[in-house]
């Protein structure tokens, strides 16, 4: 230790816990809002931080403490010495043989948010695939919002109340110890409502403009701003415009084939796109496509 001093008990030097108190006080002040860390740090590390801050500043260092639980890998504790570990960039690149398939940063983030931060989380290939599929479902529903038909004067009041109830519930869930898993479950309920009304536009009752606006804000606010999920597939800028334009040309060719009753060509285009993780859906109001990975 470079910092040493003589005391009446023995040679003194800074303890292992003091650096955290020193850094937080310097950069965040005597008291800040949220202190994070793993559950294994509750004792002795965080208890020592509290004791140090009371001694030096006369107050608690943080208003709230968030202790995350362990992240398992295929049901086992991560251990570099046992070869059971994986790095974030290895997940994104698919360069680790434990989980050899690559996953987007948003899919990995969504996977983690589906569990409460104080729950044990098991990182597996199947769980990541399920999260990937779930994220695609929410993104697809968000994309359909702009295509929903408004039936003025014939709105389903019960559904409108359900939408508002789910939104109110999301505020309650996030206020209750950041319960992201319940919030995401409610977003799936809203996605189901969007799909029902998109696939059945001729129903006697429908959504009014206010409800569609509420749905839009719910996805933007909770999934986008709070949970930090990009609401479109993981392509940006010119790449996105290029993909949209290319798909428009391909689907026009497929539409021509169907118009000429050339079913083999139509099916071939759909199947080839499916192998590239692009899903084509034929609906009452036309054809839609989405990236399922």
Locations of regions flagged by a protein language model:
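Structural preference for alpha-helix termini/caps and helix-kink/transition segments
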Residues: 86-293
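Alpha-helical recognition segments enriched in aromatics with Gly/Pro capping
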Residues: 1-146
């Amino acid at each position: 230790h470079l910092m040493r001093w003589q005391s009446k008990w023995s040679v003194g030097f800074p303890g292992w816990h003091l650096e955290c108190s020193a850094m937080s006080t310097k950069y965040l002040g005597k008291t800040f809002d949220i202190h994070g860390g793993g559950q294994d740090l509750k004792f002795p590390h965080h208890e020592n931080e509290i004791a140090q801050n009371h001694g030096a500043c006369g107050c608690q260092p943080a208003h709230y403490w968030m202790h995350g639980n362990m992240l398992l890998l295929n049901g086992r504790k991560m251990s570099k010495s046992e070869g059971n570990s994986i790095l974030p960039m290895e997940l994104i690149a698919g360069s680790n043989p434990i989980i050899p398939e690559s996953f987007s940063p948003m899919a990995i983030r969504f996977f983690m948010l589906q569990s409460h931060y104080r729950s044990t989380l098991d990182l597996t290939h199947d769980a990541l695939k399920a999260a990937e599929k779930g994220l695609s479902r929410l993104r697809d529903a968000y994309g359909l919002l702009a295509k929903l038909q408004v039936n003025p004067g014939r709105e389903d009041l019960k559904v409108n109340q359900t939408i508002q109830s789910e939104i109110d519930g999301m505020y309650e869930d996030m206020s209750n110890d950041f319960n992201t898993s319940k919030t995401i479950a409610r977003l799936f309920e809203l996605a189901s409502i969007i799909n029902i009304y998109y696939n059945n536009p001729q129903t006697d009752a429908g959504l009014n403009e206010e409800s569609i606006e509420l749905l839009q804000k719910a996805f933007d606010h909770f999934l986008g701003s709070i949970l930090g999920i990009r609401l479109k597939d993981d392509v940006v800028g010119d790449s996105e415009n290029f993909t949209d334009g290319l798909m428009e040309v391909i689907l026009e060719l497929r539409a021509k084939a169907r118009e000429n009753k050339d079913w083999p060509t139509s099916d071939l285009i759909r199947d080839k796109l499916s192998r590239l993780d692009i899903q084509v859906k034929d609906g009452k109001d036309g054809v839609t496509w989405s990236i399922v990975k």
